[in-house]
């Protein structure tokens, strides 16, 4: 039995609280157990140079951890003068994941930026960020629609993410920090609401894992992602 009485294939308690920022076009406070991430979506009526002139829009992301989101205080990356490789990797992952949800041409020549700030970290910050950022993105798109600036809805599919791994020889869904630290295999799975894979990041620690174990982990992840889709839909129905 895991923490909080969870079974191997149970998610942590999940909360998606939308509209937590009065300034951002979209926002969501997402909680995966003791991992809490604030996701905001901002709309800018311009696009980066590589998109300029195409008529399409862009969706991008930034990610960061507050200094006391972990057991010991971390120095802010701004104070160090550079972002870590981990930060750059995660924010690129979040951006790729969210672009899979939308038709960039239908967004028009504007940029939606998802800012994902980790308030408290207990494993799975990138998967929580993607799941919450999708909710914020949809709200931002709706704000553009209210201004009657979109001919078609650019959101084509939902996207969520969850971690999965092998701990003590058993497949575990939605790993917390302690489980992640001792896992023989650690994997992050991003998928659409229909179950199509967007990105899979998997690493073995110490020894390789079999194809059959990979299949079991993917099955567990997709089952968890189906539940996350339901929670996203419920959050977006909240007035």
UniProtKB/Swiss-Prot annotation:
SUPFAM superfamilies: Ribonuclease PH domain 2-like, Ribosomal protein S5 domain 2-like
Gene assigned in the entry: rph
A molecular function GO annotation: 3'-5'-RNA exonuclease activity
Subunit structure: Homohexameric ring arranged as a trimer of dimers.
Name of the protein described by the UniProt record: Ribonuclease PH
GO biological process: rRNA catabolic process; rRNA processing; tRNA processing
Transmembrane segments: none
InterPro entries with a match to the protein in the record: ExoRNase_PH_dom1, ExoRNase_PH_dom2, ExoRNase_PH_dom2_sf, PNPase/RNase_PH_dom_sf, Ribosomal_Su5_D2-typ_SF, RNase_PH, RNase_PH_bac-type, RNase_PH_CS
CDD domains, alphabetized: RNase_PH_bact
Binding site for phosphate: 86, 124-126
Catalyzed reaction equations: tRNA(n+1) + phosphate = tRNA(n) + a ribonucleoside 5'-diphosphate
